[in-house]
């Protein structure tokens, strides 16, 4: 704070720039991270990147039954849902600490959301 109680704008700007760099680094880590979702106790595994790109699908041959395609479809949907959930959890873990720092950014200005 400067004399008279005014916030130091250069310090606020420096803090905002530092947080932006940390956010960009965390987003890059998330996008590059490999996440695997599974269902049926690992019978169906879907691997993807934090960016949302699916990179592989593995299906245990013992569950491939031409007479029961519906079960396989359900397992694939379950594995995709698990992949999505794990990707969101990864993003929360990486971005959560950065979001916590936003509370200090307003410097007591009473700005909404900071």
Curated annotation (Swiss-Prot):
Its main location: cytoplasm. InterPro entries: YbaB-like_sf (IPR036894), YbaB/EbfC (IPR004401). One of its GO terms (molecular function) is DNA binding. It comes from the Bacteria. Keywords: Cytoplasm, DNA-binding. The keyword Cytoplasm applies. GO terms for cellular component: bacterial nucleoid; cytosol. Disulfide bonds: none annotated. It is found in: Cytoplasm, Nucleoid. PANTHER family: NUCLEOID-ASSOCIATED PROTEIN YBAB. Binds to DNA and alters its conformation. May be involved in regulation of gene expression, nucleoid organization and DNA protection. Belongs to the YbaB/EbfC family. Homodimer. This is Nucleoid-associated protein MAB_0319. It comes from Mycobacteroides abscessus (strain ATCC 19977 / DSM 44196 / CCUG 20993 / CIP 104536 / JCM 13569 / NCTC 13031 / TMC 1543 / L948). The lineage of its organism: Bacteria, Bacillati, Actinomycetota, Actinomycetes, Mycobacteriales.
């Amino acid at each position: 704070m400067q004399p008279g109680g005014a916030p130091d704008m250069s310090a606020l700007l420096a803090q905002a720039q530092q947080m932006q760099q940390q956010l960009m680094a965390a987003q890059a880590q998330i996008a590059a991270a490999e996440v695997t979702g599974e269902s049926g106790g690992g019978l169906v595994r879907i691997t993807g990147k934090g960016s949302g790109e699916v990179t592989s699908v593995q299906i245990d041959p013992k569950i491939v039954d031409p007479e029961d395609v519906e079960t396989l479809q359900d397992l694939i949907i379950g594995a995709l849902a698990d992949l999505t959930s794990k990707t969101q959890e990864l993003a929360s873990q990486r971005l959560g600490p950065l979001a916590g720092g936003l509370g200090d950014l307003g410097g007591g200005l009473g700005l909404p959301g900071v």
